[in-house]
């Protein structure tokens, strides 16, 4: 939600599938798969597209190596300055002042990301220059839509172990379903699903309208026109809950 991954993670997914099958899945094909709400992990999404295409499946660890080579173009745990992969092509969707504004509006914030920790830390700490941002990344909790990571983050951000308001901003059906599952797991809190279309779906296009309808049908409470629109929403949603507010971002 804070970076455009259409030219990085999604491109690595496409390239990985093409590497094994010779078939390059179209962006709409990936959107449709993500719309099922089950394929938040791009390694698993790559394997699923290969399975549906009828390609013999590689070992998962081999596919992960291929995917990581496309995405990082170097050792994920090494010097980011040496990375030559698609990660270098990730336009930011927000700047540091986005988080300052959330602070000013009375919202604590953190991140629940399906990205590998080196990727998440790179964008948060080096590109956005955030200092030790609260983060649940891949491997820290089960993959979404399991709500464990979101619940854990809310426990860190809210001043009380029960109660409070949590808004989660995401751009996939899995993100929306994570909020719905959190409501079941922790009914003592108010959980709000804010959703936004990924930037490769242009405003006014039929594809974007269809995608937003998927998010609504999945249970999103509000569709925002952009990530930055969350600032105005958070200003209008300040309030009265003395037990605190937490904004979690994909």
Language-model features and meaning:
Residues 14-20, 43-58, 153:
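Helix-loop "lid/cap" segments that line or gate small-molecule binding pockets
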Residues 21-34, 54-69, 74, 130-134, ...:
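Short, surface-exposed acidic
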């Amino acid at each position: 939600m804070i970076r455009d991954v259409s030219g990085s993670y999604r491109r690595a997914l496409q390239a990985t599938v093409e590497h094994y099958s010779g078939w390059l899945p179209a962006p709409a094909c990936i959107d449709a798969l993500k719309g099922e709400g089950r394929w938040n992990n791009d390694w698993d999404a790559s394997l699923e597209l290969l399975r549906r295409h009828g390609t013999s499946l590689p070992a998962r660890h081999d596919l992960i190596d291929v995917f990581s080579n496309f995405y990082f173009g170097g050792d994920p745990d090494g010097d980011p300055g040496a990375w030559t992969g698609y990660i270098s092509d990730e336009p930011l969707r927000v700047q540091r002042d986005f988080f300052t504004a959330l602070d000013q509006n009375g919202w604590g914030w953190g991140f629940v990301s399906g990205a590998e920790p080196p990727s998440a830390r790179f964008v948060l700490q080096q590109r956005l220059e955030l200092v030790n941002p609260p983060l649940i990344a891949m491997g820290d909790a089960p993959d979404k839509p399991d709500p464990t990571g979101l619940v854990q983050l809310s426990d860190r951000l809210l001043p009380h172990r029960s109660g409070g308001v949590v808004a989660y901003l995401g751009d996939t059906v899995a993100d929306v379903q994570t909020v719905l599952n959190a409501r079941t797991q922790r009914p003592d809190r108010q959980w709000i699903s804010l959703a936004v279309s990924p930037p490769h779906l242009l405003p006014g296009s039929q594809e974007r309208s269809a995608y937003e309808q998927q998010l609504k049908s999945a249970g999103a409470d509000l569709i925002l026109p952009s990530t930055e629109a969350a600032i105005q929403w958070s200003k209008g949603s300040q309030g009265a809950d003395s037990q605190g507010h937490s904004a979690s971002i994909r």
